[in-house]
């Protein structure tokens, strides 16, 4: 039925919580935890249900277009309602409301589909004829103050049909408003325009920022879901809201109840307990069936279980699952919930690590770059994870845009915790606070002095800038001209500020150890001044050791060769490789900037660590901690910059899932934390790379080996299309056995996940089976 005006008399609570006051509405809809109404004077009102089951007004209308000019000068906003219609012909009422912008600059149409569980909101700006705008927002007017607001990126698991690895796609950007009485309001902003373009701290608490077109017109459409909860249990409320927004009748949650590493699904015991819970979001009894398959890294199906649930209206039911991991390493739980016509599927990766107490953190060369702190970062968990992984050094951004605060208070607090854990910290001051390139050395110097006055005592060293030789290419300068700028501004400004703070001066990381830039550092005398030479090495999607030809730019080992040759010529110096690694870009499988699959990221990372040690690198930092850039943290499966992480970005529910590379990294640091020297040795085969590592532990030695006999489909200049691969399926099909002479009484082969087996030492020799995934041999003399 389509009607222009519908009259209801409803009993609702007003904003002061009074019950029993009668008000007349032109239209009213009552959901489980909210009410939407249009008053007699054509004002929209939104009410929420409190945990005490009282109805209170929360929003004066759903929102207003607000368009601003330069210096945030107000230009136009949504004025009062012109008319509205209600369509009740379908399962859920649809309300269409028309507004005019002020000064008749355009029209706004709002379409609300009203479900019992939530409101689906579509807003359109039409016939815009106003002035050029600088910015625009969709502003909500709260009639009752909220206690706090949280912001989160929301992802949805996608399962490719070609048997490639599952991955998350961007679903929505969530604002969660918490109220003093325990209730919550959720805004799930969806669509391409919702993809965060800035750090979450910069987003307003009460408004949705809109994009601007090149001709300075505001975004014309936005879509979001509005969900309310009267549930005081925040975790349960958050989960119910997410599934309500998905328009599902039931909600699934799956978590490990065994103590792990903070919010990360990292465990140091094999006996694990999981809790599977199904919640009914409707007022009718619901049946659901949840299947759980857990796959091991070796391809085995370690658990296959289906649980049936019968859940009363608005209720929940739980089932416990016990799991004993047969080996160390990464596991993937695939969960599928079926309820009526609804199907929901997700992935729960977790890792079982060998328990270990690190003893050589002060001297271990292994670190992680791209460690961020901020209001919307898992700060405490980040530090716990670093400790569990055995990261002995980190690089942390110091510029205000990187942690999105007005001062260094939050940064200082977390750096202090990091330092207390024994982890060495190198700060990086990248750009000025407005994220612009410095042009005046004095301005740059003062900016660095300002931050080091606050946090310098917590650092071991400070790096100024990042990959200047690559910036030269981006900006279209010759390397010689940009080197002159680097000397006159970056070095001249940064060096005195860093040295006066009593810190090591780390020159800006040289991308790929480019020879012309290294020679420029020597020519300008910077090499003599800097305490540490910093380089970055990348080669994705190619294997790190595809070639060692120094003339090849996009080659990891070639970058090491170039740097080693330069240091041998100019005089050795401390050398940090504080960026290396590979992205697992799910939706970019072709081209020189494409990524690798999850297993290959771990395998190639292990190769990079051994290669770097063998060329004399003093500190090696894998990039990066999480799948996020330094300025904004969102899910972007098509962008390689957002997929370098050892871990996925923390999900909507607060969980931090590891990739295989996280488990591999933890195992490598456990084996090699006391490494003193690494050198390449012959394995008797042209297609096997082998390395001997001397350890501080008396009577112990470690070998690292892998085979290059098999090359993956994207490990060639001729064909760089990645072959689809599931993370529990070994991508290496060819094996190569080599015989190596050793001076040892026993030998134990360890895989990247931490599992080991004995091999006999016969006549001073051992036989080792190799593939493209490195293995380690622990020798006891």
What are the language-model segments listed below?
Residues 28-30, 168-253, 297:
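Beta-strand-rich recognition/accessory modules
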Residues 23-102:
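Acidic-aromatic substrate-binding/catalytic surfaces of carbohydrate-active enzymes
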Residues 217-236, 758-781:
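C-terminal beta-strand-rich structural cap/linker in extracellular carbohydrate-active enzymes
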Residues 582-583, 588-665, 682-683:
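Aromatic/acidic polysaccharide-binding cleft in carbohydrate-active enzymes
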Residues 481-608, 615:
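Noncatalytic carbohydrate-binding groove/subsite architecture in carbohydrate-active enzymes
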Residues 20-28, 120-195:
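Polysaccharide-binding surfaces and accessory modules of carbohydrate-active proteins
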Residues 382-388, 392-450, 454-455, 478-507:
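Aromatic-lined substrate-binding rim segments of carbohydrate-active enzymes
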Residues 270, 277-279, 284-286, 682-743:
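Carbohydrate-binding surface patches
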């Amino acid at each position: 039925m389509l009607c222009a005006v519908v009259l209801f008399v409803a009993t609702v609570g007003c904003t002061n919580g009074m019950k029993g006051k009668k008000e007349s509405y032109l239209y009213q809809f009552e959901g489980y935890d909210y009410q939407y109404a249009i008053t007699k004077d054509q004002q929209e009102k939104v009410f929420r249900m409190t945990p005490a089951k009282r109805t209170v007004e929360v929003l004066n209308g759903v929102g207003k277009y607000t368009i601003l000019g330069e210096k945030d000068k107000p230009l136009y906003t949504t004025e009062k309602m012109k008319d509205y219609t209600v369509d009740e012909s379908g399962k859920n009422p649809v309300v269409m409301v028309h507004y005019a912008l002020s000064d008749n600059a355009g029209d706004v149409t709002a379409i609300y589909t009203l479900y019992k569980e939530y409101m689906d909101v579509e807003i359109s700006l039409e016939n815009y004829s106003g002035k050029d705008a600088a910015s625009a927002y969709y502003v909500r007017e709260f009639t009752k103050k909220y206690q706090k607001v949280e912001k989160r990126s929301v992802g949805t698991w996608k399962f490719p049909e070609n048997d490639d690895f599952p991955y998350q796609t961007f679903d929505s950007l969530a604002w969660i408003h918490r109220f003093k009485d325990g209730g919550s309001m959720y805004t799930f902003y969806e669509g391409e325009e919702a993809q965060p373009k800035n750090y979450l701290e910069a987003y307003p608490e009460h408004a949705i920022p809109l994009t601007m077109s090149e001709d300075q017109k505001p975004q014309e459409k936005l879509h979001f879901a509005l969900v309310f909860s009267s549930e005081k249990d925040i975790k349960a409320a958050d989960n119910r809201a997410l599934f309500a927004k998905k328009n599902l009748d039931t909600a699934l949650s799956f978590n490990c109840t065994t103590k792990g590493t903070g919010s990360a699904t990292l465990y140091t015991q094999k006996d694990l307990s999981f809790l599977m819970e199904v919640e009914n979001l409707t007022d009718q009894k619901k049946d659901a069936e949840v299947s759980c398959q857990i796959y091991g890294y070796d391809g085995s199906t370690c658990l296959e279980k289906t649980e049936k649930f019968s859940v009363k209206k608005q209720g929940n039911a739980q089932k416990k699952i016990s799991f004993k991991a047969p080996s160390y390493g990464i596991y993937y739980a695939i969960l599928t919930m079926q309820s009526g016509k609804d199907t929901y599927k997700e992935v729960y990766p977790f890792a079982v690590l060998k328990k270990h107490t690190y003893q050589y953190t002060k001297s271990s060369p292994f670190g992680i770059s791209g460690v961020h702190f901020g209001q919307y970062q898992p700060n405490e968990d980040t530090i716990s994870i670093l400790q569990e992984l055995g990261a002995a050094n980190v690089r942390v951004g110091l510029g205000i845009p990187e942690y999105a605060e007005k001062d260094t208070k939050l940064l200082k607090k977390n750096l202090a915790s990091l330092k207390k854990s024994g982890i060495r910290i190198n700060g990086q001051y990248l750009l000025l606070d407005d994220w612009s390139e410095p042009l005046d050395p004095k301005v740059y110097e003062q900016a660095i002095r300002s931050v080091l006055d606050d946090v310098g005592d917590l650092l071991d060293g400070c790096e100024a800038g990042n990959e200047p030789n690559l910036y030269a290419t981006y900006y279209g300068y010759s390397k010689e001209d940009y080197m002159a700028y680097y000397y006159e501004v970056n070095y001249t400004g940064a060096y005195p500020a860093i040295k006066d703070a009593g810190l090591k001066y780390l020159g800006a990381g040289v991308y790929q150890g480019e020879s012309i830039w290294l020679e420029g550092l020597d020519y300008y005398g910077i090499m003599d001044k800097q305490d540490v030479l910093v380089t970055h090495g990348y080669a994705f999607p190619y294997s790190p050791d595809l070639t060692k030809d120094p003339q090849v730019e996009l080659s990891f080992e070639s970058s090491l060769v170039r740097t080693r040759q330069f240091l041998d010529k100019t005089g050795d110096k401390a050398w940090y490789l504080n960026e290396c690694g590979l992205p697992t870009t799910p939706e970019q499988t072709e081209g020189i900037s494409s990524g690798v699959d999850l297993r290959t990221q771990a395998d190639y990372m292990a190769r990079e660590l051994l290669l770097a040690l063998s060329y004399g690198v003093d500190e090696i930092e894998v990039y990066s901690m999480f799948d996020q850039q330094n300025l904004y943290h969102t899910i972007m499966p098509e962008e390689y910059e957002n997929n370098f992480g050892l871990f996925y970005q923390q999900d909507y529910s607060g969980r931090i899932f590891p990739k295989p590379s996280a488990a591999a990294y933890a195992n490598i640091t456990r084996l090699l934390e006391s490494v003193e020297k690494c050198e390449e040795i012959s394995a008797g085969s042209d297609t096997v790379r082998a390395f001997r590592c001397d350890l501080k532990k008396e009577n112990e030695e470690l070998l690292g080996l892998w085979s290059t006999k098999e090359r993956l489909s994207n490990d060639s200049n001729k064909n760089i299309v990645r072959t689809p691969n599931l993370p529990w399926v070994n991508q290496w099909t060819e094996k190569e056995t080599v015989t190596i002479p050793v001076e040892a009484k026993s030998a134990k082969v360890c895989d990247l996940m931490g599992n080991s087996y004995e091999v006999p030492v016969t006549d001073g020799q051992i036989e080792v089976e190799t593939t493209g995934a490195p293995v380690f041999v622990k020798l006891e003399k």
